[in-house]
């Protein structure tokens, strides 16, 4: 099993245990075909490849922000996303390192708190 982290568009998170052949699990987690984006040697973002084409799929603020930091504001990441570690020499996914797991969960928690406070303000 390889640890991964799903971050939903509402900033909630879920730790996933991916099997060795994790393609179907990744597709299920993002709701369709997957696209891998390497953000760092040990951090890969998985998103829905057709996210912008699916009616009703919301932007993922965290995914978009991390994409922008690496590649500039050239794309928007839509829908729920999954983070894994990089890949090994054979191209297989690696587990998400604990340091990334903690940082990403903290970021999602802070944004969820801010989002909920704003929602109450405008309610």
What are these regions (language model features)?
Residues 1-123:
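Domain-length accessory/inserted modules outside core catalytic folds
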């Amino acid at each position: 099993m390889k640890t991964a982290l799903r971050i939903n568009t509402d900033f909630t998170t879920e730790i996933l245990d991916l099997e060795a052949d994790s393609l179907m699990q990744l597709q299920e987690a993002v709701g369709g075909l997957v696209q891998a984006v390497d953000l760092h040697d040990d951090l890969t973002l998985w998103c829905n490849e057709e996210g912008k084409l699916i009616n009703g799929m919301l932007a993922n603020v965290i995914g978009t922000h991390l994409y922008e930091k690496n590649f500039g504001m050239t794309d928007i990441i839509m829908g729920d996303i999954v983070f894994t570690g990089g890949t090994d020499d054979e191209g297989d996914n690696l587990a998400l390192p604990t340091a990334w797991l903690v940082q990403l969960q903290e970021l999602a928690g802070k944004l969820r708190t801010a989002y909920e406070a704003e929602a109450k303000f405008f309610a």
